[in-house]
Amino acid sequence: MKRTTYIIFGMLLTGLVVVCAGIFYASTQVTGWDNIFLDIKGEKKTVQLPQCRVIQMVAVRNIIATGEGEEKGIRMPAFGELPLKITSGEAGQGSFTYASGMDEFMTMNSVGDTLRIVFDFPNDKLEKKYQDLYWLNLRSEEMIIALPDHVQFLQTSLEAQKMTVEGLARDSLSLMVQDYATINDCNFRALTVQNGAWLFNTGKADNLHLHLNGIRSWNVNANSFHVDTEYLYAHGDQRCTLEKGECRQVVWMPQSEGASLDIKLKEAATVVVK
């Protein structure tokens, strides 16, 4: 074997050793999959909701600090593995069901006609392995709100949470979500939605009010969800697609001077300008 060949072989072997060492080191630094999640356990607990017209669900974003007390980031609680179901309250009474372990991280308080459900995960309530995570993934059983008739507006700003609304029959209701929402087997005379991504799966809404600023997407299952009139609200320039069979008519409701809507139609339609 020539000397040059020995040199090349040695360089390749050295490189392989370095790569293997790097992979081993990285594997010791990565948090295990099970450690990514904060599991919140306990028996199911149901509490009665106080009289209110508005329910807000929010999560505190705590500061992550260095050992010297300097701020190095913000911890974001993520509810991707902690879904929320909204059902109808019985006899006008509302309730909230959740895993009892959540009591350590949750408070409920009323201000005027608004009930605030606040989730907070400060360092003094977390094990060391969670304290430096910028993205705190939560995992627990489904939370359920039995919504009483007197609640007119439900707002949830919980990151990555999937909300399902099932079996509601209401004259009117307003809903705002942070991420994902599905409507199943509901009947509304008027439904207003804001933010997030929406699937109108089964049921009907005679009047569907969509605030386009903040809504990432919406999809109406025309085979099983009926909409008579869609009202589209927006500031600035907006565009959307009206799918075949999505609704009977659309009403454009500009919210600022110069607001415009670029709408793509998937079936024959009549445009009436007032």
Where are these predicted regions, by residue range?
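Phosphate/pyrophosphate-binding loops and the adjoining catalytic core of nucleotide-dependent enzymes
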Residues: D228
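Eukaryotic acidic, serine/threonine-rich low-complexity intrinsically disordered regions
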Residues: I183-N187, T192, G196, T202-K204
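Intrinsically disordered, low-complexity terminal regions
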Residues: M1-M176, T182-D185, N201, H209-H211, ...
